[in-house]
């Protein structure tokens, strides 16, 4: 979810740290296991604390083999998951699917490969391309984040030059302290990319479990993979769906709208998001779709009046897009969620405008 090389991340470090520390965003203190069906489990990882967010992991145990969706961020967490899987079954993990290239979903690949040497790691072709570019540099990017946080403490100002409040300073200092164990671990990480890529939907039979691997369209990234279990009516969505606040800091929101529509049309009673608790209907998926569509429709209306985006700036259009009507449904009255929502929607408008500029 937290895209460590996104230009927007460094600009939003203070709010990101505040949110990652917020109990109202991620209340679980340890990984939480939910059984979704017979021999199908979701592991919802701690998403805050040390600032290294880990996506959800889904485990599908067949009569012959095990299929894992997303290997999470820190290898130590992946090893804990592997130990849990071995409590459930003595069958080997034969497949790990990385839903997309953000490293909170795939930096644990090496831990799985070490534990199961015959493992096949699957990703969409576009995902592997991005993994190979960005995966090996994880430690360096996190060092830059630490340096940015330290600079804020030293200067007493955020990256926009605004003075830090006493609360902000405490949050940043605590974040640096929490991040140290993860930074130490990243020094020894060996990046493991996908070993098998796909461009078209395919099915794997694990033995009494049919696993369909799908590409429903671009959204969060260029290669978002979705896993569908038709017998159990379960969809594993990756970061196409993130709760409680969508992760829309880059990606392809104009296409994401249709991708979410495609996802909602799968016959599913359970949806596993990339981050957050399991869902049992498509209500939240459609809410995210509607948010993006509202932003795009308002932007298009402004462009129809003002002219093509290539001749405008974001400042020319952002005041014409009002997404406050969605705020209550995403954030309620929680101040941290409201701050996250406002940052997300500002970036949604920015990315939509950038897409429009290329038309």
Predicted regions mapped to residue ranges:
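Bacterial N-terminal signal peptides
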Residues: 13-24
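C-terminal regulatory/interaction regions
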Residues: 305-359
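Divalent-metal (often Zn2+) His-rich catalytic cores of metallo-beta-lactamase-fold enzymes
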Residues: 234, 254-316
